[in-house]
A protein has these predicted regions:
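Active-site beta3 strand of CheY-like receiver
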Residues: 44-50, 55
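Alpha4 helix (beta4-alpha4-beta5 surface) of REC/receiver domains from two-component response regulators
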Residues: 61-64, 68-71, 82-103, 110, ...
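Two-component/phosphorelay signaling modules centered on CheY-like receiver
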Residues: 11-29
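Short hydrophobic/Thr-rich beta-strand motif most characteristic of the beta2 strand and flanking loop
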Residues: 25-34, 40
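Conserved sequence signature across two-component system core domains
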Residues: 7-8, 31, 49
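Non-catalytic signal-transmission and effector/linker regions of two-component phosphorelay proteins
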Residues: 1-3, 108-120
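His-Asp phosphorelay/catalytic-motif detector in bacterial-type signaling
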Residues: 45-47, 72-77, 104
Length: 120
């Protein structure tokens, strides 16, 4: 069973997305902060990470976390999720943030599942 780590400070997102992905047969692990997510990566060894961009800790913490994760775990695909406005979001691209995919919230679950299956 493929493992997905969801890192998002929105508990509703963690619960809803986690439940939907579990129903698709994925093993879900979740963290409500970047720090907790970083701690889980080594113990869980996820096959893919869904990472929110905006955290209360720091405005660009999600982008920084993606780069840090890629430095330590270059083979784990990262999907960056954001609800920030399009102008700001498009100032960044996949290469800048070290992510395989960059998705705007609300994410269409069928599209997300298709993308996940393409990577794992």
């Amino acid at each position: 069973m493929s493992k997905i780590l969801i890192i998002d400070d929105d508990l509703d997102i963690l619960e809803t997305m986690g439940s939907l992905l579990e129903n698709e047969g994925f093993e879900i692990h979740s963290a409500d902060s970047v720090q907790k997510g970083m701690e889980l990566i080594d113990s869980v060894s996820p096959d893919l990470i869904l990472l929110d961009v905006m955290f209360p800790e720091k405005k660009t913490r999600g982008f920084e976390a993606a780069a840090e994760i890629k430095a330590k775990h270059p083979k784990i695909p990262i999907f960056v999720l954001t609800a920030i406005n399009r102008e700001y979001a498009f100032d960044f691209n996949k290469e800048d943030v070290k992510a395989e995919e960059f998705l705007n919230k609300p994410v269409k679950i069928d599209r997300l599942i298709k993308l996940i299956r393409n990577y794992i």
